[in-house]
Each structure stands twice: as C-alpha cells, then as structure tokens.
Amino acid sequence: MKGQKIMTEVKRHVEIAGYGVCLPKNTVQFKDQTRHRVVENEETQLDLAEAAIQAALENANLSMKDIDCLVSASAVGVQPIPCTAALIHERVAKGLSIPAMDINTTCTSFISALSTMSHLIEAGEYRRVLIVSSEVGSLGLNSKQKESYELFSDGAAAFIFQSSDKDKGVIASLQRTWSEGAHDTEIRGGLTAYQPKEYSEETKTNFMFDMKGKKILLL
C-alpha cells in the first residue's frame, strides 16, 4: 500500500533442489470430494515417506549421501519413541550418519521445519536439508465426527532445500500461537495424559482425532 515499506530483501538464501509426492492408491468419495486414504496393513506412513523421498532425490538428481540433515515434519508420528525421522532414516539412509530429527507443530509442522532449517542453512550448519511430511491421519479419525472424518487425505511430500548464492529464498517468516485453542484440535491419548494402558472401549475416543472446527475458525 502507498506509504508502506514492502519487505523484499532475502534474509535466508535457500532454494528448492527437488521435490516428490506420494498418494495412496485407494480413494474414498464424499459427495463431490475425493480423499486419498491408505488401506490398513497395505500401505504405511513410512511407505509413503520413503516413496516421496525417493521421488524428490530423483527429481534433484541426488542421493541420500548428498543430504546433510533429514527432518520429519508430520502432524502425527509413527510411534512415540524413537522419532519418526529415525525410522525414515532406517528406510532411506541406513548406514549413513546423517542427523535425523522431528520438528512437530501438528498441522503446521512443515512450515515450522522450513522456517527453522532455513536459518541453519543460512548460518552454514547445513548445506542441503531434506524435509518430509507423511500423514496417515485417516487411521485415527472418528467416523462419527463428520467435520474431520471427511476433511483429510493421507499422503506424503518431500522437499530438498539447499543453500543458494542467488538473491532468492526466504524473505520473512512469522508464527504465532493462540493457546486458548490448544484443546480444540487434539488426540489426547497415547502418551502421558492418557497412557496406552488406559485404552478401553469406553476411552477409545481419547485416542482418536478430535476437532472443534467452527470454534477454531473463530479464534
């Protein structure tokens, strides 16, 4: 707008070297909406992640030996321990000492990972970073909660970011947290709030995805 200074200076010089995606073969139809959903015991979260990573490496004409850090940025991991990145590392980088870590802020995990890792690339800590988001959220959805059950697809996407000597990259990033909505989108069970040993038919909804969509929109 007139009189306002527009921020255009590149702060973090990173570029996309390659990317890849993987969607489950199975689809589910909700009226005119198509969702990709895994079939339980046929495709896993790790399968999707591995396929997306291999596609990204091929797209970039690189191998895992060219990657300095592997980041898993998924809303929900494979299991509490170890981190999902370690399990993905076992699939795609076994025998290599590439550091692997999770960056998790649920639905905004990829954005958080890119923001964080772009700083480390700019600082010279890493030259090339692979970020993968892999989701099979359908396995934890409550079929009785229509607003969430019909909303999500499963799938994976992987991007390889690398340092750049060109004037392009991240201009700015901004994140905010409104914790008054912390309990409007949650899976309560599985860790220390509701431990796995507490699972029963009566408590099973605590181990499913629960979303108060309209309330979130009004935050």
Residue ranges of model-derived segments:
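Acidic, glycine-rich active-site loops and adjacent beta-strand->loop/helix elements
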Residues: H13, A73-V78, T105-T108, S133-S138, ...
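Conserved catalytic cysteine-centered active-site region
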Residues: V39-D47, S74-V129
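Phosphate/pyrophosphate-binding loops at sites that engage ATP/ADP/AMP, CoA/4′-phosphopantetheine
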Residues: A52-D68
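Flexible, glycine-rich active-site loops centered on histidine and acidic residues
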Residues: E122-A156
